[in-house]
Amino acid sequence: MAAEIRLFTCLNDNFGYLIHDPATGATASVDAPEAAPIIAALAREGWTLTDILVTHHHGDHVGGVAELKQKYRCRVVAPHDRNGRIPEVDLRVAQGDVVKVGGLLARVLETPGHTLDHLAYVFDDDKAVFAGDTLFSIGCGRVFEGTYPMMWDSLLKLRVLPDDMRLYCGHEYTAANVKFALGVEPDNPALQARAAQVTALRAAGQPTIPTLLGEEKAANVFLRADEPSVAASVRLKGADPVAVFTELRERKNKS
């Protein structure tokens, strides 16, 4: 049976996610920005939390872990954070590991850059990737702990996933990302189409997530740093993709 995924808002602009296996009743929360919205979403669905899949240690992704662990006695799956910033961890995972949520299988990708410990969880059978703060719709995360080459390599790991894979990211940043991207590629038809879609969704009070990776590959300038047209738009014609990505990210930091 196909996984059931529920999306809701946490904190200010974080997304909360539940992924449920109807065959076994297992339910995972991807990250736990705060406990209350997750508890409410579980109650609405009549589900019980069995797992928390942590993408990285930032407080707006793990702030609800301890309370949820106490309430549900759920398993906490997390990266190898050497500084102990993720509470209540039961299972540490790394690149290539597979996590079971009931009968659902999540393949672990290490995607460092935003933080050194960052992970993405890929549910191949269900065509869903939970990318945390590495890849956003029409954007990417800031590089806080890693390096720009590291972040570019992480984006490439996500870019090779199938076009029909649904992207679930950590924040609702799409409108701001679109505004920046249009300044880089104003004539990109895929970006123009996504911009119109985002405007309509936000006007209706709807989330802009999930999006398809195929759409991101066509419209997300950060995934397109190795495209000659993108390099030319930032006056780096012929430059290495890492240099182009670095310039894009530095510009976005200042926007």
Swiss-Prot record:
Q: Which gene encodes it?
A: gloB
For the biological process aspect of GO, one term held by this record is: methylglyoxal catabolic process to D-lactate via S-lactoyl-glutathione
Q: Which SUPFAM superfamilies match?
A: Metallo-hydrolase/oxidoreductase
Give the organism the record lists: Rhodopseudomonas palustris (strain BisA53)
* One MF term in the entry's GO annotations: metal ion binding
Q: What class of enzyme is it?
A: hydrolase
The free-text function statement in the UniProt record for this protein reads: Thiolesterase that catalyzes the hydrolysis of S-D-lactoyl-glutathione to form glutathione and D-lactic acid.
* Record key words, sorted: Hydrolase, Metal-binding, Zinc
KW Ribosomal protein (keyword) present:
no
Q: Name one Pfam family in it.
A: HAGH_C
> What CDD domains has UniProt attached to this entry?
hydroxyacylglutathione_hydrolase_MBL-fold
This protein is called what? Hydroxyacylglutathione hydrolase
